[in-house]
């Protein structure tokens, strides 16, 4: 046998040895990766009615269903979502229990018990969102006036209607965090934190920016004091949509900022457990018609970010991998200028197919706590 043949044979033997040694390790790594994939729990939509989120008219259930049926039926009788957040309640009106042409006891007249029950009859959880960017100054005024009473009023509405409450306070520079703490304390005095999720009125959440570079004081306070896994005060946060629909990499980069925190900031923003927040995508309110996230699941961000959302690992907070899920902005007509999700349009092809693809549980199950 020539020396070249000996060398070649030796090389083959080494290659085979390396294959048999590394193959089990590779298999184990893939198995570990599969084991850390967590199913989506929260798959919800903000609902804006037909008047850019004012909810200023009373609507019959049949008329409302004719415009929004895709939410409760993705085509096979199963809802497209397991959460609907009726948006928005004006905080100052809620504090004052205002009654006017568009408001009753501080709540928009369109947010009726009939509409709430319409969703609940399909096992869809319902929440009311207080605030939004339009009402940021109203949040400021209400918190400066009587934040405790605002929290008590919010809890009373939640109890009466059987809904949860979402805090959407978008003061980016100088939020009244002392007032917001008093609001939360008052709410929790009536509705203590419920890890089981069985009590709808105990569900209290907050909206944060897409990443950690906007609403910085709010993110710092919320992540430090309200969204910890050791002493949770709020159930979870929604990482809101950015100014426009992101790319896959941009969306994941934004969400990763919450997971990593911002230790370089002063004060630092600590890491947020993946199990303590959702990521948000546009399904309407875009300039050029409805996006694929509404109409076409394949290739949409619901599709391309799915692996990340279900598997992102904790980085300093929490013990389980995967975010809670997705929120979608927004059903029906969030803007007077954009395209609505109403007939002949529908989001069954995007959100609905995503619901089926990810086997979204309806009703929403108890949420991971860490």
Describe each region flagged by the PLM.
Residues 34-265, 271-304, 320-323, 332, ...:
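Chitinase-like catalytic core of GlcNAc-active glycosidases
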Residues 366-370:
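Short, solvent-exposed mixed-charge patches
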Residues 326:
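Glycine-rich phosphate-binding active-site loops on the catalytic face of alpha/beta enzymes
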Residues 302-312:
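Catalytic-core region of carbohydrate-active enzymes that cleave or remodel glycosidic bonds
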Residues 2-11:
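Bacterial N-terminal signal peptides that target proteins for export
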Residues 11-21:
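Bacterial N-terminal signal peptides
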Residues 24-32:
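Sec/Tat signal peptide C-region and signal peptidase I cleavage site
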């Amino acid at each position: 046998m020539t020396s070249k043949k000996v060398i070649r044979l030796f090389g083959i033997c080494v290659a085979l040895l390396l294959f048999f040694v590394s193959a089990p390790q590779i298999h184990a790594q893939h198995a570990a990766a599969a084991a850390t994939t967590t199913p989506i729990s929260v798959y919800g939509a903000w609902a804006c009615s037909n008047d850019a989120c004012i909810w200023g008219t009373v609507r019959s259930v049949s008329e409302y269903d004719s415009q929004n049926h895709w939410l409760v039926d993705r085509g096979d009788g199963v809802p497209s979502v397991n959460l609907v957040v009726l948006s928005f309640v004006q905080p100052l009106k809620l504090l004052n229990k205002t009654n006017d042409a568009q408001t009753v006891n501080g709540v928009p007249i369109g947010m009726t018990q009939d509409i709430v029950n319409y969703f609940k009859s399909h096992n869809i959880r319902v929440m009311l969102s207080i605030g939004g960017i339009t009402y940021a100054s109203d949040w400021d005024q209400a918190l400066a006036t009587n934040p405790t009473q605002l929290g008590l009023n919010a809890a009373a509405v939640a109890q009466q209607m059987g809904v949860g409450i979402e805090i959407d306070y978008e003061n980016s520079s100088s939020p009244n965090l002392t007032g917001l703490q008093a609001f939360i304390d008052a709410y929790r005095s009536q509705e203590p934190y419920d890890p089981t999720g069985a009590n709808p009125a105990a569900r209290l959440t907050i909206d944060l920016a897409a990443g950690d570079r906007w609403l910085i004081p709010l993110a710092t306070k919320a992540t430090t004091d309200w969204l910890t896994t050791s002493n949770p005060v709020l159930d979870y946060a929604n990482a809101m949509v950015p100014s426009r629909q992101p790319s896959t990499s941009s969306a994941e980069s934004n969400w990763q900022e919450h997971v990593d925190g911002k230790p370089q900031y002063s004060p630092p923003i600590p890491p947020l457990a993946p199990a303590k927040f959702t990521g948000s995508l546009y399904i309407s309110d875009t300039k050029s018609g409805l996006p694929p996230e509404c109409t076409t699941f394949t290739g949409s961000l619901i599709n391309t970010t799915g692996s990340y959302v279900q598997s992102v690992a904790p980085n300093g907070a929490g013990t389980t991998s995967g975010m809670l899920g997705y929120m979608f902005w927004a059903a029906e007509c969030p803007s007077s200028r954009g395209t609505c999700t109403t007939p002949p349009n529908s989001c069954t092809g995007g959100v609905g197919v995503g619901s089926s693809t990810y086997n979204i549980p309806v009703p929403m199950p108890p949420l991971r706590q860490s």
